[in-house]
Each structure stands twice: as structure tokens, then as C-alpha cells.
């Protein structure tokens, strides 16, 4: 079905005007971003195809421009628009979080990262950087890929922590299997991070492993 065959009230732009932005599905939001379809496919068809490729919306923030272009109907112009929209959303989210969020317990931190990490198909190592009042001052994904001691080097983590004048950090990574039970490599990485933190004077408050709607705090479990 092409856009001109869609009921006027059901077109994304008209739907937004009539019912508000909250009434739009994720695919319809993507359709608004990419704006046009092709000669043979509507913009909504292409938007739905994008959402089928990225099973969870959080995956889009880690996709490269080449990955978006693998979707039939998406060229460099449309891929660039999607990436710009995703990046804008990330920056708005970070500014909001940094002004408002204080981490008092592992659950507070998990609420920040669970939506992003729980449904990814690759392991992502993510850090939250805090000030002396345990307020979030910055957060960033540091590594992508299998977590092991040769990849996750404390130097990279604490270089950024020092640059942000952090008093402490919390580290997270996801298990794509959904099971947050720690591996021997997870424990080795945690030990090295805690030791490096003691040397530079920046405390590793916790290393939390994210599974499917569940997590394990290595600090609470007494692993370090």
C-alpha cells in the first residue's frame, strides 16, 4: 500500500496533527523521520522493515550507517536522518538524567540501563560516572563485544572517569542469553577494575550484569 492509498487520517503526519505525537507507533515515528518511500513501497512499509531488523528499539542506538543501509529502501540520506534522530534522543536523555538522577542503590542504576541493555544481541560494557553526591554526571558504552579481560582494560574506563572528574563509577554489561549469572571472565574484569579504582582514587561502586528483565549485582553478591 502506497502513502496515497492510506486513509488521510491514518497518514503519520495527519495522525500526529489530529491525535498528538503519543498516538503514533514506533514505525510511524520512523516513517516521519525518513519522510518518503520508493516508487513501489510506501514509507510505512519501509519503516516497518526497519523495525523488523532491529527487534528492540534500543538496538538502533548502536547501529552503524551501513547497517541501516542494509534495509531495502534505505539509502545514505534516510540512514543519516535516522541516526541523527537517535543521537538527538540520546543527548536529550543524557542531559535530563544528569540533572535529576541520584544513585542510592543498584535498583536506581538498573532503571537507567535496563531498557538499553536487556534486549541487545551483543554484549555491551557500559559505565555510569558519579560525583561525590552520587549524582550521575555522565554515562557511556565503553566496549561492544564479548567481555574478557583483554578487551575491557581499566585504562580506558578510568581515563574517561578522570576526564569527567568522577568520584566513583558503576559498570554494567548485558548477557544476550538473558541469564545474568557471572562468568569467570566477568569476575576477573571486575577484580581488575576495582584494583585500578583503588589506585587512582575512584571507587568502583558496583558491576551489574543485566539479563532479560533481571540482574545480578556483583557487589551485593560479595564478589569484590
Swiss-Prot record:
Keyword Metal-binding assigned: yes
Example GO BP: proteolysis
Positions of Zn(2+) binding: 173, 175, 186
Domain of life, per lineage: Bacteria
Transmembrane segments: none
Molecular function per GO: metal ion binding; metallopeptidase activity
CDD domains, per database record: MPN_DUF2466 (cd08071)
Keyword terms of this UniProt record: Hydrolase, Metal-binding, Metalloprotease, Protease, Zinc
Keyword Transport: no
Sequence motif: JAMM motif, positions: 173-186
Family named by the database record: Belongs to the UPF0758 family.
Name of the protein described by the UniProt record: UPF0758 protein lin1584
Higher taxonomy: Bacteria, Bacillati, Bacillota, Bacilli, Bacillales
Amino acid at each position: 500500500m502506497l502513502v496515497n492509498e492510506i486513509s488521510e487520517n491514518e497518514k503519520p503526519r495527519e495522525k500526529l496533527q489530529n491525535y498528538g505525537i503519543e498516538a503514533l507507533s514506533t514505525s510511524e515515528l520512523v516513517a516521519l523521520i525518513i519522510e518518503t518511500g520508493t516508487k513501489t513501497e510506501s514509507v510505512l512499509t519501509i519503516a516497518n522493515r526497519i523495525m523488523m531488523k532491529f527487534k528492540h528499539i534500543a538496538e538502533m542506538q548502536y547501529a552503524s550507517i551501513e547497517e541501516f543501509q542494509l534495509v531495502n529502501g534505505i539509502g545514505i540520506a534516510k540512514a543519516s536522518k535516522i541516526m541523527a534522530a537517535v543521537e538527538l534522543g540520546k543527548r536529550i536523555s543524557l542531559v535530563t538524567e544528569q540533572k535529576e538522577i541520584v544513585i542510592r542503590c543498584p535498583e536506581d542504576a538498573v532503571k537507567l540501563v535496563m531498557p538499553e541493555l536487556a534486549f541487545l544481541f551483543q554484549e555491551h560494557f557500559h559505565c555510569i560516572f558519579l560525583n561525590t553526591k552520587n549524582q550521575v554526571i555522565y554515562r557511556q558504552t565503553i566496549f561492544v563485544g564479548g567481555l574478557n579481560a583483554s578487551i575491557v582494560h581499566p585504562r580506558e574506563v578510568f581515563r574517561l572517569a578522570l576526564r569527567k572528574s568522577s568520584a566513583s563509577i558503576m559498570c554494567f554489561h548485558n548477557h544476550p542469553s538473558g541469564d545474568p549469572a557471572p562468568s569467570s571472565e566477568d569476575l576477573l574484569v571486575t577484580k581488575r577494575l576495582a584494583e585500578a579504582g583503588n589506585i587512582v582514587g575512584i571507587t568502583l561502586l558496583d558491576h551489574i550484569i543485566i539479563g532479560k528483565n533481571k540482574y545480578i549485582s556483583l557487589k551485593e553478591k560479595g564478589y569484590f
